[in-house]
Amino acid sequence: MPIIIDKDLPARKVLQKENIFVMTKERAETQDIRALKIAILNLMPTKQDTEAQLLRLIGNTPLQLDVHLLHMESHLSRNVTQEHLTSFYKTFRDIENEKFDGLIITGAPVETLAFEEVDYWEELKHIMEYSKTNVTSTLHICWGAQAGLYYHYGVPKYPLKEKMFGVFEHEVCEQHVKLLQGFDELFFAPHSRHTEVRENDIREVKELTLLANSEEAGVHLVIGPEGRQVFALGHSEYSCETLKQEYERDRDKGLNIDVPKNYFKHNNPDEKPLVRWRSHGNLLFSNWLNYYVYQETPYIL
């Protein structure tokens, strides 16, 4: 939240250089405040788990949020009841004439398919195109980030020989970017994917800025012009047990799945997971909401 200080206070310039949100008394006395409209396009099969993960993070700020859950009309969800979707979700057709302060596009377990082979790709393209003029900032996660990078900037994805699965160390590539305010130079984030985007492809697109990278996991955070589009290739929203649940699910199916790296204590799946990404996960979402949604969105959408 902003700090209200005198516009002539010498510390004001120092704080502004550090991306601390300061506000003059004059602006504070005249500003209009309303709840931020946030849409979550939930592409995950485990919809209720994903709801809790994302709402936990975006709810951990002083901002008042009006959240709208969206699902794909062109896809039949098999892991959630129709009653749940009817009660709590809308489709794009329901909201296409509205504007939103923020949009979150989640990951989806379809990464081994070409984008054009995904049954809801055409609908997703309409939503991503809509976001360019009707949403102040869009946060794309995992496959949602790959889809956004491909649709908006033509960045391809590549198959991995082995699943990128575990918790990995990342390094901040750009200092003094608002999305990374408060980040340590090295931080952890979970990854769970069979495909990747590559650093060279990101750097070849002049509109994109690579913010965080990992020697082992590759590209993690990318941002577009003015923060209108943010891409997170990892899963900073994951709860403590998520990787464990994914590991046990695939193991019980008889799939050849490795133990998630750097996750269980002593790398032993019989021991408890060690959470090393929670603080930076909270920072990522709060910075996105604060700097790229709250501070940038108009009062009248």
Curated annotation (Swiss-Prot):
The active site is at C142 (acyl-thioester intermediate), H235 (proton acceptor), E237. Substrate binds at K163, S192, R249. The record marks E111 as: Important for acyl-CoA specificity. It holds the Pfam family HTS. Keywords: Acyltransferase, Amino-acid biosynthesis, Cytoplasm, Methionine biosynthesis, Transferase. It comes from the Bacteria. GO terms for molecular function: homoserine O-acetyltransferase activity; homoserine O-succinyltransferase activity. The keyword Coiled coil does not apply. InterPro entries: Class_I_gatase-like (IPR029062), HST_MetA (IPR005697), MetA_family (IPR033752). It is found in: Cytoplasm. Its EC number is 2.3.1.31. The record marks S192 as: Important for substrate specificity. Its main location: cytoplasm. It catalyses: L-homoserine + acetyl-CoA = O-acetyl-L-homoserine + CoA. One of its GO terms (biological process) is L-methionine biosynthetic process from homoserine via O-succinyl-L-homoserine and cystathionine. GO terms for cellular component: cytoplasm. The keyword Methyltransferase does not apply. Pathway: Amino-acid biosynthesis; L-methionine biosynthesis via de novo pathway; O-acetyl-L-homoserine from L-homoserine: step 1/1. PANTHER family: HOMOSERINE O-SUCCINYLTRANSFERASE. Belongs to the MetA family. Transfers an acetyl group from acetyl-CoA to L-homoserine, forming acetyl-L-homoserine. This is Homoserine O-acetyltransferase.
